Design a protein with these regions (language model features):
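Aromatic- and Gly/Pro-enriched helix-to-coil junctions and flexible linker segments
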Residues: 21-129
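Sec-dependent bacterial lipoprotein signal peptides
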Residues: 1-22
Length: 129
């Protein structure tokens, strides 16, 4: 009799532990500390930025010596296929880092809002728009 009671209690305890262990944890994604990215047009916002600061006077123009080429007709493909962006972890994108840290352009750091434009464009998936 004692053995039957003990076995019954063990089965009940086992079922209880297993049913609690089957709880479905819902993991919600963390909120982005930067907030939602603003809309950035590659052709309307970034190409003018590149024209003003990057692809003039022998820097990131059509020549292969200073890749990537940032002339309007080649810029998107050069950036995307050259590995300069990372849409999974946008703030680790090379294009963003060199502008944000001030290492490019060599004539002086761009205003912070220009680095933010690049980051937001990458955060939006780096569309060719």
């Amino acid at each position: 009799m004692r053995r039957t009671i003990f076995t019954s209690l063990m089965i009940i305890a086992f079922v209880g532990v297993c049913s609690v262990g089957c709880y479905n944890d819902v993991i919600s994604p963390g909120s982005d500390p930067n907030g939602p990215p603003q809309f950035v047009s590659f052709s309307g916002d970034l190409i003018p930025l590149f024209n003003a600061h990057c692809n003039s006077s022998g820097c990131h123009d059509a020549g292969p010596a200073h890749a990537p080429s940032l002339v309007p007709e080649k810029a998107y493909n050069a950036i995307v296929s050259g590995g300069y962006i990372n849409t999974a972890v946008p703030n680790s994108s090379t294009l963003y880092i060199v502008v944000q840290t001030g290492s490019m352009p060599p004539t002086g750091a761009l205003p912070a809002n220009n680095a933010q434009l690049i980051l937001d464009w990458v955060r939006n998936g780096a569309p060719n728009n």
